[in-house]
Amino acid sequence: MYFIYFEVWRFFSGEGYFNMASITFEGVKKSYDGKNFVVHDFNLQIQDREFVVFVGPSGCGKSTTLRMIAGLEDISEGKLYIGDRLVNNVLPKDRDIAMVFQNYALYPHMSVRKNMAFGLKLRKVPKNIIDKKISEAAKILDIEQYLDRKPKDLSGGQRQRVALGRAMVRDASVFLLDEPLSNLDAKLRNHMRSEITRLHDVLGTTFVYVTHDQTEAMTMGDRIVVMKDGYIQQVDAPQDLYDKPNSLFVAGFIGSPQMNFLDAILLKEGECFSLKIGDMLIPISRGKVDGSDLESYVNKTVIVGIRPEDIHNEDVFIKVSPESAFDADIDLIELMGSEMYLHFEFQGHRVVARVSSRVTTRKGDRVKLSIDMHKAHIFDKETEIAICH
């Protein structure tokens, strides 16, 4: 790591350096036919040097939004700034951005060295500066030994490093990465996630990263922008997004296995609230009620969200929370090493619990489980907006 930091310092101290830049969206919209919008009223401030991840299902508008930053897609309405500069009508080559694509976009007939140098040659950068930039970037990315090879002679991970290196030598103020790990196998994806995160740490420039993989989003971003149908659903730090999803969609999209959702009727007796889930009546803690709008949902059906890890099989937890304990007939077990996923029916709903594999459980067993209601999420059934966490 010290070697990497030293090389980056040398990289910055040479000809040129990364200009820092924020990115600001003001009411940005995108339509291809002038009628139907694929990105709606997009408002977002990305801070200088921040690593922001756009995540969402296919077709949610995340790549289109990234391409608008790059200038590869026109903006139909609204304003886009890089730093203090309005860039709506600025050509891609003049936006001071570098982009890394899913398919690497390397020239197959050129060596790694020539691929990395190509953009600089077009800009008529002197050869001695090009050579220095390539040498320094290759050291940082550990691809020095591949500089004279063709892309076909490299592995997927090596080709991805070359694509990153080609972006690095541009000295761009913004890095845009469009699903760069999608073509890699699982082991290599895990490795490259840490490589890209480390690269951001040492370069200290603005990164915008697009993915459909919530694991990538949660492990890489300073903040995550969750998108659906062209709309921003929530913008938050990874842990806040996980702990306090503002909608049913975000709650279900972030987390694996995904959150369990149960229909329940909210009841109140005196000052005490409870949830009727099937034939079970489970009290709600006072702390969850305070500051919420639960009062207006009394005698109405709501949706209760329970993360798999908040369903426990430990005797000590069951004794502490007997009111939320129940018997479950396990019909499927996924063993994941140190933990396992238990699948079962609960009050007419399919439910998954994530528990320690140290407790011996087999398919067909009846086990005692208990829900940690302090961690429960309650959503409006009609609007799917969070009521309380």
What are these regions (language model features)?
Residues C272-D331, R350, T360-H389:
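Glycine/charge-rich catalytic "coupling/switch" loops of P-loop NTPases
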Residues A70:
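Helix-to-loop junction immediately C-terminal to a conserved catalytic motif
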Residues V55-P57:
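The feature captures the beta-strand-to-loop junction immediately N-terminal to the Walker
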Residues G78-L86:
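Conserved ABC transporter NBD signature motif
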Residues S76-K79, I129, D229, A376:
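Conserved coupling/switch loops of ABC nucleotide-binding domains, chiefly the family-specific signature
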Residues P92-F249, F253:
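ABC ATPase nucleotide-binding domains
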Residues F42-V53:
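Pre-Walker A (P-loop) beta-loop-beta motif of ABC nucleotide-binding domains
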